Amino acid sequence: MSPAPPLSARAPRLSARALVRRFGGVTALDQVSLDLPPGRITALTGHNGAGKSTLFRCLSGADRPDSGQVLLDGRDITHLPEYTRARLGLARTFQQIAVFPGLSVADNLRVGAEQAGRRGSLEADFAVARTLRLLGLDHLADRPASGLPTGTLRLVELGRALSAEPGVLLLDEPAAGLDRAESERLAVLLTALAADGLAVLLVEHDRELVDRIADRVLTMSAGRLLPADGELPSATPIATAPSDGTADGA
């Protein structure tokens, strides 16, 4: 039996194909193509207004491109809503911390598991317990999120995403508000997750963190991805399944 190919050589988990997004007369995304392979951390950098947030929103399902495709494991998910993408294995965090202050840490994580379709199941209990241990939050499981420091809240939000047991993780400024020790802990954690096969897209201004953990760094400018290492960020087309044609009214 032939050995399995390295994770980085396998088909991408998430892909963008020629995405275009316009707002009035402004082109926020201009024919953007991108592949996120399993087991690798891809960092996206660029000045404010370069198109990073728009690309992130189109990939996550918070926005729709005017043209182009978003593919998850070769399946066209361009018109699928966020909650459906979550059930298919795509999770995200937000630049502004998004936790439920009135819920305990464990129940915040449970939200992620339930969004992935594990509502009220033993599978959800296991996912929450596993993620609490992974993030070192066991001792805070029953604490309400309100009043916790920024670094801990960032971990709680990351835990919500990881409790869904995704194959693709989109992180929007995950190190914002963290001190040096917390950023170090985040770097170790994300590196371990990628080594376990997770495909990660990181939008981050902390260049030290990016330089330490990213397998490749892509730069956006004026709605375009700049070539990296002499090649376009997405150079190899992949076969895709037919579009579901499902929309959520957007």
Model segments located where?
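Conserved ABC ATPase "signature" region
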Residues: E123-L140, V188-T191
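Catalytic Walker B motif of ABC-type/P-loop ATPase nucleotide-binding domains
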Residues: L169-E173
